Amino acid sequence: PEHEEYYRDQNLSESLKAIYDHRCQVCGMNFKIKYDEPFAETHHINPLSQGGADISKNIIVICPNHHRIIHKTNAEFDCTKLLYRYPNGYEERLVLADHFEQKSSWG
């Protein structure tokens, strides 16, 4: 299958990582503290490939482990409860959600 490219705003991604100091919004893991190296990824809640927007309200900062398991299991995000629901019924609430609660219109 052909791989389609989607525009991603790297400044937005880096800004969100800075807000959370590179901590995973799901588990709070901070590689910078443990390994002296900032290491986090950003994940689109609604995938760009399915019409999701590259805006702050559609992006979370996440550790590589959570990024992989969310994709592998196709976990669903509950926007009202700010949690991921996995196919086996397990639910994991975001421990960090500052940018969802801001009344800002950036991104």
Q: What spans do the regions from the language model cover?
A:
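A short mid-domain helix/strand-loop element embedded in enzyme catalytic domains
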Residues: 1-9, 13, 33-34
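A detector for short metal-coordination/catalytic motifs
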Residues: 7, 32, 37-107
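A generic local structural motif
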Residues: 10-12, 27, 49-50
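Append "and, occasionally, other polyanion-binding protein interfaces
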Residues: 11, 22-25, 40-43
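Short, flexible, mixed-charge glycine/proline-rich loop motifs
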Residues: 12-20, 52-56
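Conserved hydrophobic/aromatic pocket- or pore-lining residues that grip, position, or stack substrates
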Residues: 16, 24, 67
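Short, well-ordered alpha-helical segments in soluble proteins
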Residues: 20-23, 31
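Short cysteine-rich clusters marking metal-coordination/redox-active sites
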Residues: 24-27, 63
